[in-house]
Each structure stands twice: as structure tokens, then as C-alpha cells.
């Protein structure tokens, strides 16, 4: 479960992305990442307001972070962010990567991006 293959950072998640993996990723993100990056990854959190030197980035504004790059940052740390390898197994780190990909898509998505049956359900549930 390395983030590098033949010296290159991998561009796909090397394990099956399942609902259980996504739920694990969400749980671990909420415990270890959201405290600084915010629950939706926008860099808005109570801790971030106290970080005068350099606040955590809005994860949605980072240009095309491939899965291997995100895994590497979680594993090794970056800037003021420490490594989370001691707290998260490789499987859990890939789960966070998978969840972050879904989170990014959810924040940039529109109703038209959802399948027709989901669009219909959302239109019925959301008041206008």
C-alpha cells in the first residue's frame, strides 16, 4: 500500500473503494483532520482561527492533488502538519484519501451531477 510505484507517486487508490472504506475515512478525517481543516475541508475551524503563522489550507482549493500525493502528506506531514502515520494505518490513510476525494466532489457538485432518482428525492426534500 505504498504511495509510490516505480519511483512515481500513484494516481489511483490501490485498494477497493467501498462504502465501509468511505465511512472509515470519514470517521478518521473527523477525528484527525477536521480539527484543523474543518468538517468540510474548507480550512474553517476553531483551531484554524488560532493559527496566526499559517492557517491550514482549504483542501478544495489545492489543485489536483492525486491520491498518492495526499497519502504522502498524511504519511510524512507537510509544512506545519505533522505525520499521521503513527496514528493511522496505511489502510486508514487510504480511507481518508478516498473520503477526501468524495468530499472535494461533494463541495463542487451541482444537483445536475446527481443521478436522476437522487435529484428527484432532493427536490422533494429541500424547500424552495
Regions found by a protein language model. Give the residues of each.
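Flexible coil segments in periplasmic/lumen-exposed cytochrome c-class electron-transfer proteins
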Residues: 7-8, 30, 39-42, 46-47, ...
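Amphipathic alpha-helical recognition patches that constitute DNA-binding helices
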Residues: 24, 58, 69
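Amphipathic, alpha-helical segments enriched in basic
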Residues: 4, 8-11, 34, 49, ...
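Electrostatic cytochrome c docking/interface patches
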Residues: 1-28, 120-128
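Short Fe-S-cluster ligation motifs
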Residues: 62-77
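Sequence/structural segment immediately N-terminal to covalent heme-attachment motifs in c-type
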Residues: 19-42, 75-76, 96
Amino acid at each position: 500500500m505504498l504511495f509510490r510505484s516505480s519511483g512515481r507517486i500513484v494516481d489511483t487508490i490501490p485498494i477497493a473503494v467501498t462504502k465501509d472504506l468511505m465511512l472509515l475515512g470519514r470517521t478518521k478525517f473527523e477525528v484527525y483532520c477536521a480539527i484543523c481543516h474543518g468538517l468540510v475541508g474548507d480550512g474553517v475551524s476553531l483551531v484554524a482561527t488560532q493559527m496566526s503563522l499559517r492557517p491550514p489550507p482549504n483542501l478544495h482549493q489545492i489543485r489536483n492533488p492525486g491520491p498518492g500525493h495526499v497519502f504522502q502528506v498524511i504519511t510524512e506531514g507537510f509544512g506545519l502538519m505533522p505525520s499521521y502515520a503513527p496514528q493511522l494505518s496505511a489502510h486508514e490513510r487510504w480511507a481518508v484519501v478516498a473520503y477526501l476525494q468524495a468530499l472535494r466532489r461533494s463541495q463542487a457538485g451541482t444537483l445536475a451531477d446527481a443521478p436522476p432518482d437522487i435529484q428527484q428525492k432532493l427536490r422533494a426534500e429541500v424547500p424552495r
